[in-house]
């Protein structure tokens, strides 16, 4: 039964990812409580009030200085709205959780992550391995959908 819900919320994260204006990669995140209620969503993009024009996405040095990852955007949106993510599940579509986002996920008390991606790109392997070690130590359950088994 849970697998059905994991797939549903992963599809929601995929839909949210389409809101990103990043032409190279769209990532989506959805935080859900035990009652299967959506608490917050996020996608990779610039902070509120920062103009997200195409030229800024084309210049990687500018883009990487400005972009907020989907996972942290989801956490910030929950915080902005006064919503606790303690014991929530975070569904992430598009890329694995990086080690910087892992810190935030652990800090707010998210206890399960479901990730969906075709494969983990080589350039993200080191960061994901750091995330995995942190999640293991902090007792955060990590699951994969779409046939990924990392």
Question: Model-found features: residue ranges?
Answer:
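Zinc-dependent deaminase catalytic domain
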Residues: 1-150
């Amino acid at each position: 039964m849970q697998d059905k819900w994991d797939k549903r919320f992963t599809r929601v994260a995929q839909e949210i990812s389409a809101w990103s204006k990043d032409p190279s990669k769209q990532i989506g995140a959805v935080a859900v409580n035990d009652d299967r209620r959506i608490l917050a969503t996020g996608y990779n993009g610039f902070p509120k009030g920062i103009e997200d024009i195409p030229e800024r996405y084309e210049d990687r040095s500018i883009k990487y200085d400005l972009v907020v990852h989907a996972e942290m955007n989801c956490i910030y949106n929950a915080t902005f709205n006064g919503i606790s993510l303690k014991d929530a599940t975070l569904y992430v579509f598009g890329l694995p959780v990086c080690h910087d986002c892992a810190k935030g996920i652990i800090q707010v008390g998210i206890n399960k992550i479901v990730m969906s991606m075709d494969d983990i790109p080589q350039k993200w392997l080191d960061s994901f391995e750091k995330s995995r070690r942190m999640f293991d130590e902090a007792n955060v359950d990590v699951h994969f959908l779409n046939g990924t088994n990392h």
